[in-house]
Amino acid sequence: MAVRDRRWYVSLDALKNELGITATTHDAKLKRYIERASAYVERVTGRTFHPVTATRYFDAPVGTPRGALYLGDDLLSVTSITDDGGALTATSYFLYPLNRPPYRRVELLATSDTWTFTDSRQQAIIIVGTWGYSASYDDTGATLNGALSSTTAATFTASDGSLIEVGWSLLIDSEQLFVTGVSSNTVTVQRGNNGTTAATHSTGATIYRYVPEPDVTEAVVLLAALWYQWRDMGGIQSQRIGDYAVTYVDGWPVPEIVRDTLARLTPLV
C-alpha cells in the first residue's frame, strides 16, 4: 500500500509562534489545520509548491504549432521525454517559458515538429522529471550524526535536532524526507516523500530543507491560524472586522488577502 506524500507549507513551530502557543496540548489539532490549509492552497491554485518526482502521461497534440504540448502543470526539470518513436534528445525540444522554470509547455524543433504515435495518440508521450512551482532549499545547519543505513528506518540522529522542525520537507542526497517528529536529536520521518526513492545516507551528510514561496507560506499561516481560532464559527458566510474581510468557503473562513494571493498564484493555462 502506497503511503501518501506529505507537503506542509509551514512548520508546526512556525504556526505556534504565530499564535503565541508554547504548550503541546493542541499540537494534533494544529497539524490537522496545517495539512488542510496546505491542501487547500494546492487545490485552489492547481499547483504543488514542493518538488515532486513523477512520471506523467500526455496525449500527443495534433495541429499545434511546432508540436506544442501544453502540460497543465509546472515542470522544473526533465529526466526524459519519450513518445512512440523512442526517447527525445535534449536538443530536439525547447521548454517554455524560456530561461527559467517552472515550464508549462514543450515545443519541438521546427525541423521535427510532430510527435510520433502508433495506434493512438492517447498517452503516447511520457515525461519523467521533477514537477512543482519551485525547488528552493536551505541548509538546515544540521548533518547526519551516524549513517542512515536502512531504507526503511523511520528515524535518524541529527547533529543538532533543534535545527529541524516538524512539517519540514528535508532533502538528504536525492531523497526527500517529511519530518513528523523531533525529540532531542532524534528525528522521525516519512521516507521517500514526493516520489523520491528511500536510500542509504552516510554519516555527516548535509540536511537541507525545502523552502516554499513566501506568499504560499503566508497564506497557509493565515488560513491555519484563522481556522484554529475560529473553528466554532462555521455557520457565518462573511464577516468584516475593520479592514479585515473574511469569506466562508464550505464553512471555513478564507481571508480576502489569501484569496487574492492564491488568485495571483493560479496559472492562466
Regions found by a protein language model. Give the residues of each.
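Divalent metal-cofactor coordination and adjacent catalytic microenvironments
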Residues: 1-269
